[in-house]
């Protein structure tokens, strides 16, 4: 899987970026995602994610992660999955590094654990997981924890 990460504000260290990439590659492998799939991940500030949230979701507040799935076709859009040998574009993840730091402190987690959680959580949304219904939430939560535990990222381990 090809992952394109953007951190223009230099909000993360090289090690943290590599951790996110490793977590996403592992998740893609575990979820049996095609090798020619593509995903973009952008790391932003609270102000930047608030602007995106306002423009695209109509919510004028900062949030931790936003997922934009590419499989939701609009009118006159091409279904790229029908094009042989073309990469499967899964979508975009936008992660607020500031909100990640705030939540890590609030929940008593290492920053890297919260960062990994947000990456996995957003990615699983792109893959069709959801948490609106309790049963779906339980499935998604279990999957997230399995993936994070593989990287020894546990809750409340400061």
Curated annotation (Swiss-Prot):
One GO BP annotation of this record: rRNA processing
The keyword Metal-binding is assigned to this record: yes
Entry-linked PROSITE patterns: UPF0054
Cellular compartments annotated: Cytoplasm
Principal place of residence: cytoplasm
SUPFAM superfamilies assigned to the protein according to its UniProt record, in alphabetical order: Metalloproteases ('zincins'), catalytic domain
The protein's required cofactors: Zn(2+)
EC number(s) from the headed UniProt entry: 3.1.-.-
Pfam families referenced in this protein's UniProt entry, alphabetically: YbeY
UniProt keyword list: Cytoplasm, Endonuclease, Hydrolase, Metal-binding, Nuclease, Ribosome biogenesis, rRNA processing, Zinc
Keyword check for Protein biosynthesis: no
Cellular component aspect of the GO annotation: cytoplasm
Highest taxon in the source lineage: Bacteria
Cofactor note: Binds 1 zinc ion.
Binding sites annotated in the UniProt record for Zn(2+): 121, 125, 131
GO molecular function, one term: zinc ion binding
Task of the protein: Single strand-specific metallo-endoribonuclease involved in late-stage 70S ribosome quality control and in maturation of the 3' terminus of the 16S rRNA.
HAMAP family in the cross-refs: Endoribonucl_YbeY (MF_00009)
Family affiliation: Belongs to the endoribonuclease YbeY family.
Protein known as: Endoribonuclease YbeY
Species whose genome carries this gene: Exiguobacterium sibiricum (strain DSM 17290 / CCUG 55495 / CIP 109462 / JCM 13490 / 255-15)
Lineage start: Bacteria, Bacillati, Bacillota, Bacilli, Bacillales
């Amino acid at each position: 899987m090809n992952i394109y990460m953007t951190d223009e504000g230099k909000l993360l260290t090289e090690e943290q970026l590599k951790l996110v990439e490793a977590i996403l590659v592992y998740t893609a492998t575990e979820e049996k995602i095609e090798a020619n799939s593509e995903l973009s991940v952008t790391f932003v500030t609270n102000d930047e994610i608030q602007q995106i949230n306002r423009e695209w979701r109509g919510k004028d507040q900062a949030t931790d992660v936003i997922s934009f799935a590419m499989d939701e076709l609009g009118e006159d859009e091409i279904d790229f999955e029908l094009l042989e040998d073309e990469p499967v574009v899964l979508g975009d993840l936008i992660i607020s590094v500031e909100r990640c730091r705030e939540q890590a402190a609030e929940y008593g987690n290492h920053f890297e654990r919260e960062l990994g959680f947000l990456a996995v959580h957003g990615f699983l949304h792109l893959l069709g997981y959801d948490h609106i219904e309790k049963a779906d939430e339980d499935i998604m939560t279990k999957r997230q924890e399995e993936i994070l535990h593989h990287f020894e990222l546990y809750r409340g381990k400061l």
